A protein has these predicted regions:
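Short alpha-helix plus adjacent loop in nuclease-associated cores
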Residues: 1-34, 84, 88-93, 201-212, ...
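Short, solvent-exposed helix-loop connector elements
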Residues: 4, 33-51, 107, 204-211, ...
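Extended, highly charged alpha-helical segments
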Residues: 17, 21, 25-66
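Short helix-capping/linker segments at secondary-structure and domain boundaries
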Residues: 26-30, 62-63, 126-129, 177-180, ...
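Glycine-rich, often acidic, oxyanion-interacting loops/wings at catalytic, nucleic-acid
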Residues: 45-156, 285, 290-291
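Phosphate-backbone recognition surface of nucleic-acid-processing proteins
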Residues: 152-253, 290
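Low-complexity, acidic/Ser/Thr- and charged residue-rich accessory regions of DNA metabolism proteins
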Residues: 202-206, 241-295
Length: 295
């Protein structure tokens, strides 16, 4: 069938199709998927980490734009080297010279100053949101009765080594704070980390992960998986990773780290919902006594 085929699309056609589906559902066929709508409070709570991530992406774009404008003239200002500090950037910009020793064009300096003003504004907004997030988690750790379920679970996750405030808050606001999972398969599927088999007759192959779930959680879990291997080397999941890769190359490691991300997500779900500490995991030094309280 041609992919460019033009299909009829009218309200009448849609209503007839919907009525047939409803009739099949009434007869007991499984033709609809249940959509779990988050409560209004959970929707609002997700805005903070999402906005924080969006601002960080915007900051990166502005940084790259400033560096590109200056690099074209032979000027290198690296934010990782401390050049993007508010106290020194404008001073270094005024003293910068082109590759041939001549002053920077006035129009270029003006545009860079405009970009710098945007950078400072975004940086201030990031600090404000990060402080709000830290205050919310601090209140949850102190047992504030007004703390939301997502905040309390995020505070619990941060007790584990390798799990920071940002990652814990995203996990709980996107998943653990309001969603209900019946089994580990649902947990892996919601992040799109489960496999996609393709079989026919006696033949079959694995097509990789489905990538059909929450992209934010999927990306975060891969990052957390690498951190988990670093800060939790004696955990069962980390040992499994080392046993699997052996002398594997980068491709084998990439495939194995996705499996670690899936396993870790399930373990964190068991931890926040059932109090089961991941096998071999350790707590941060200031929370070493939490293992007995959670178990």
């Amino acid at each position: 069938m041609s992919r460019r085929k033009r299909n009829v699309k009218t309200d009448t056609v849609d209503v007839r199709k919907l009525s047939r589906l409803l009739a099949r559902e009434h007869e007991g066929e499984d033709v609809f998927r249940v959509v779990r709508v988050p409560p209004e409070e959970a929707e609002v709570e997700r805005l903070l980490p999402r906005q924080l991530k969006a601002l960080k992406k915007q900051r990166t774009r502005i940084t790259n734009r400033i560096q590109a404008r200056l690099f074209a003239e032979g000027v290198v200002l690296d934010p990782r080297g401390g050049s993007f500090r508010a106290q020194t950037f404008l001073k270094e910009l005024s003293q910068a010279l082109r590759w041939d020793g001549s002053p920077l064009p006035a129009g270029l300096v003006y545009m860079v100053r405009q970009d710098w003003a945007q950078y400072c504004l975004v940086e201030e907004q990031i600090r404000d949101l990060a402080q709000r997030q830290r205050r919310a988690l601090r209140r949850a750790r102190e047992g504030d009765p007004e703390a939301t379920p997502a905040q309390r679970k995020a505070a619990l996750l941060t007790e584990l080594r390798g799990i920071g405030d940002v990652g814990a808050y995203v996990l709980t606001t996107e998943l653990f704070g309001w969603r209900v999972f019946n089994n580990r398969k649902e947990v892996g599927a919601i992040a799109g980390l489960t496999g996609t088999p393709s079989t026919s007759g006696n033949g079959g192959r694995e097509q990789g992960i489905s990538k059909a779930g929450n992209a934010r959680v999927r990306t975060l879990m891969v990052e957390l998986a690498w951190l988990w291997l670093r800060y939790q080397p004696e955990s069962r999941t980390s040992k499994w990773f080392r046993d699997q890769i052996g002398k594997a190359g980068s491709r084998g490691k990439r495939r194995a780290i996705v499996a670690v991300a899936r396993k870790l997500l399930v373990e964190l779900w068991h931890f926040v919902e059932h109090g089961v500490v991941p096998d071999g995991a350790t707590f941060k030094p200031e929370n070493a006594g939490l293992a007995q309280r959670v178990a």
